[in-house]
Amino acid sequence: MSLFAKLQQRAGEGRPVRVALIGAGKFGSMYLAQIPRTPGVHLLGIADLSPDGARANLARVGWEPARTSATSLTDALKHGSTHIGEDWRALVSHPAVDVVVECTGHPIAAVEHCLAAFAQGKHVVNVTVEADAFCGPLLARRALQAGVVYSLAFGDQPALICDLVDWARTCGFPVVAAGRGHKWLPHFSQSTPDTVWGYYGLTPEQAARGGLNPKMFNSFLDGSDGVAGAFHHHVHRRVADQRAPVLADVRAAVLQRVGQRGG
């Protein structure tokens, strides 16, 4: 199967895959950098709490302002451009949208976005892996009930791990363990958003140019990332949501105590 050939075919037939993107921050901008170079894909709209921030990220990855000049989703559909706004519900419910890419990095919001997309019959690519760590199987069940596809982003670590496991089993190798390792030293727990860039070998100016969020990157470093809490890994005691339960109902699968997680 050639994904590129299939996308070329859709482009030639004038029926591109129409995408709705929720969240145009650091991770969203990585995808935005690809879209102008990918045939057969039309980014119909972007929903972000900061439309101006989304436009700044689009400019950073090389988008021309004319590409996002649409005054509405209907206008974007008519002219093949992209609309930027704050109303994610309007974006998810638009009849022309084929797939929703959830890219907020906020696990609770991501669950709500996924459920709303399923209810509208939309496929979902969930880049917010923290949401999947908390209640991925339940989200997958809801997608199955709705008759749509729920997937993580291929290229991100969880999806690549699954791909490697599938490859190994197909080759006849027994897989006894699978996971993603990350270097962690005890003094990393002392990192704060004000000091984090030194651990990554970056200056604050370099991080700012790249649109990097110090709170988010600090959560990767100091052990307070939501994924660690979801899997009951040992993390620093200050993290209030350590061992937060994942409840039976996906709508209730939220942190029961306020935790520290950079968005």
How does the language model describe each region?
Residues 36-40, 59, 63, 93, ...:
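Generic secondary-structure signature for well-ordered alpha-helical cores
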Residues 109-120, 129-148, 153-156, 164:
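Rossmann-fold NAD(P)-binding glycine/threonine-rich loop
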Residues 143-147, 151-225:
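Rossmann-like NAD(P)H-binding beta-loop-alpha module
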